[in-house]
């Protein structure tokens, strides 16, 4: 309840700041009209025109916000369908990477074929809008002693304006018990990670009923429990194929609300993100040391974006941004994408229950162990899936993310930002840009200013030393991209 109140207070504060900002712009417009223009026009002409223009702009964006499709998209996510998919995945007995692949009813082979078929059924419902493919490689490793084919299932919903720009939601197909090499025992993996996989399938159902300027990818990744193999294989394939993946939302355990700590909470979620890019070069690190950006990698600003989507579109859900790649000493399938230079975050429940993770099914000292269906809260899984849906939709609806963002302002009273304005069909929905800034100790972007369709802007009397800065692109419908921090430190790529 406290988290919900805090979130509501934050939202109210943001609305108040936005309203004050709009009023300030209107007032500034009037004050600026006190002097007669060089052309000799009467000051009242300028007052009326500018005031009406500002008010009209405000009304347009207010109307766009009120009609934002993301509210309906969040409502369209079904807890019942997610439950059905989780039960189907659990019904395969085990989905261990080393399990049966020939059976139609048991093992990871049956599970991944069912997932591919489900994506095809979804595609049939949207007139063939999904390209369904498998991406695989044969691997060996500490937890894969014999050469084994690791197969991931991917569905691609192509964008209408900028099909090469992609955002991805992923879940994991595989499961495990106590022994990481046990590929035969029952391993239901209801929460870890049938919940995330079911979320990705449900996101495809909801979003495939609409068209977006950018491309959305839905992925079922294998081999996670054996060493994050599926993510690495898909990331390598993406780089070879020239996929321009701007963001990966990795969902790993999104259905548990009662933790090992005794806390039951269905109002919060965690988002993990790297603070600096794994692929940062020594030269880039030296530059960052003197210019800042230790908490402004593209992945971290992706986390901020997800946090903002929760505040705006998901009732009674507050995102806890964790300034860490993943849980302490642990890993998830966003990591291999980060290691390939692709921004990505992990979205998951706030309170984990370790009796329900990587455990043989048993009762010991009166304690029930095992990742069974009874440990999943389907409405909570629906809520986190809806968070993914609105985040994917927002990024796919936004214009191309700002590229080549640069900043200057050392020993000056003002700060100037520059970026490249794209051309061609991909930029058809680009309305302009929004400049953001915040105190260096603030976790979320605090102030912003819409600056129009320009390739640079100077914030007068905002000293570069005291703040951090970024730029977002804004569509003609008022939908903004994630904020891009200047330089290689914050770049989402070309």
Language-model features: locations:
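Residue-level detector of structural "landmarks"
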Residues: 1-3
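Metal-dependent peptidase/peptidase-like ectodomains
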Residues: 221-335, 340, 344
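A non-catalytic alpha/beta surface segment that caps or lines the substrate-entry region
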Residues: 73, 81-158
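Extracellular fibronectin type III
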Residues: 476-494
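Active-site-adjacent mobile loop/cap segments within catalytic or ligand-binding domains
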Residues: 90, 254-274, 321-397
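Conserved aromatic anchor
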Residues: 413-428
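Beta-strand-rich modules
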Residues: 459-479
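Alpha-helical metal-binding/catalytic segments enriched in His/Glu/Asp
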Residues: 155, 169, 174-175, 180-228, ...
């Amino acid at each position: 309840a406290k988290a919900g109140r805090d979130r509501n207070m934050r939202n109210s504060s943001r609305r108040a700041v936005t309203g004050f900002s709009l009023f300030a712009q209107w007032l500034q417009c009037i004050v600026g009209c006190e002097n007669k223009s060089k052309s000799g026009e009467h000051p009242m002409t300028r007052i009326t025109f500018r005031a009406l223009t500002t008010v009209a702009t405000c009304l347009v964006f207010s109307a766009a916000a009120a009609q934002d499709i993301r509210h309906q998209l969040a409502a369209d996510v079904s807890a019942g369908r997610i439950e059905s998919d989780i039960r189907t995945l659990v019904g395969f007995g085990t989905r261990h990477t080393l399990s049966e692949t020939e059976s139609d009813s048991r093992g990871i082979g049956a599970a991944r074929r069912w997932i591919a078929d489900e994506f095809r059924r979804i595609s049939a419902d949207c007139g063939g809008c999904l390209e369904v493919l498998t991406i695989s490689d044969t691997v060996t490793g500490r937890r894969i002693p014999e050469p084994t084919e690791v197969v991931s299932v991917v569905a691609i919903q192509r964008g209408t304006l900028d099909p090469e720009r992609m955002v991805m939601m992923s879940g994991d197909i595989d499961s495990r018990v106590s022994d990481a090499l046990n590929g035969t025992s029952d391993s239901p993996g209801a929460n870890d990670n049938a919940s995330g996989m079911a979320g990705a399938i449900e996101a495809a159902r909801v979003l495939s009923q609409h068209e977006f300027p950018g491309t959305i990818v839905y992925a079922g990744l294998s081999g996670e429990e054996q060493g994050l193999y599926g993510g690495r294989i898909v990331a390598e394939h993406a780089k070879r194929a020239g996929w321009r993946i701007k963001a990966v939302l990795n969902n790993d355990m999104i259905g548990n609300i009662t933790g090992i700590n005794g806390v039951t909470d269905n109002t919060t979620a965690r988002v993990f993100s790297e603070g600096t890019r794994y692929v940062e070069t020594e030269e880039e690190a030296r530059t960052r040391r003197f210019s800042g950006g230790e908490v402004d990698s593209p992945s971290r600003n992706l986390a901020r974006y997800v946090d903002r989507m929760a505040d705006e579109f998901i009732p009674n859900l507050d995102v806890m941004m964790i300034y860490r790649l993943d849980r302490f000493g642990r890993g998830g399938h966003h990591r291999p994408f980060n290691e390939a230079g692709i921004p990505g975050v992990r979205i998951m429940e706030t309170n984990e229950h370790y009796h329900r993770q990587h455990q043989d099914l048993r009762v010991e000292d009166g304690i029930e162990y095992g990742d069974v269906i009874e440990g999943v809260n389907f409405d909570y899984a629906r809520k986190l899936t809806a968070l993914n849906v609105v985040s994917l939709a927002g990024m796919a609806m936004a214009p191309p993310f700002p590229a080549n963002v640069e900043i200057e302002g050392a020993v000056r009273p003002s700060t100037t930002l520059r970026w490249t304005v794209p051309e061609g069909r991909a930029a058809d929905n680009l309305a302009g840009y929004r400049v953001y800034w915040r105190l260096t100790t603030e976790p979320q972007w605090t102030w912003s200013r819409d600056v129009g369709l320009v390739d640079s802007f100077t914030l007068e009397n905002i000293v570069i030393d005291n703040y951090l800065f970024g730029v977002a692109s804004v569509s003609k419908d008022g939908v903004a991209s994630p904020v891009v921090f200047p330089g290689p430190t914050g770049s989402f790529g070309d």
